């Protein structure tokens, strides 16, 4: 039997046919048609699944479930996308629209960051863990929580918004409208903001040279690369970033006594340049002497597909 995993993004719908060993044996990537709404999205998913099954020499009778993850909030019943701004979905009953095509085959719907944590649990950095936390650091900060060996949906079913836990009271403004959120300090966007400020303050810096003093040329990789090369302005930005991320990670360890915290997303590509000082920072701030480890997330681009495919297993 196969599980289908579908990862809906702002530009593409990635889907895969996942076998019992959690290998993705067939893949499809199809454009997301924002103007088509939920009806067209359900059709695209069905068409893609049929194509994958045909390629695999299988049929719908060989399907065990269809799992879908989206970058947005899901209602407690796991049926309606409350808000997914990048998709222009608001109170969208996507599960029911997909189910119309698949009949008796179970369909599951979840947030994409929660799905990524589930993928790490079944095939990645969290294998064997009962309690673990995933931070995904990109334009924003997402995250997922594993409690008792299962994806945590929240007490009221609203999920886990790690990026919007408060880190600095009255601090930097966040996209959510609050101030001082983890996302406002630990995202690629935060690195860019602080690097631009440092560049403008230090025209002699490598940050200034690499961007020709233009804010629009700054990105997180440039800032981190300058820090790796020893630029003092960039190092100050990077060290502040590590300090804030260390506080966020240590807080989760102190709260949950989790076995493992994984860091994913584009910023994690900095490798040991990030993880070595981060582990030291977390150790200094952890209440427990014997605390959980801090590791890179490993699922990469397959996190959405594998996590979506594992949604049924999470409910068993």
Task: Locate the predicted segments by residue.
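ATP-binding/phosphotransfer module of carbohydrate and carboxylate kinases, centering on a glycine-rich
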Residues: 1-65, 75-78, 96-107, 119-129, ...
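Short beta-strand segments
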Residues: 7, 67-71, 110, 134-140, ...
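A short acidic/small-residue loop/turn micro-motif
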Residues: 31-33, 89, 158-161
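A charged helix-plus-loop insertion that forms the helical arch/lid used to bind
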Residues: 79-90
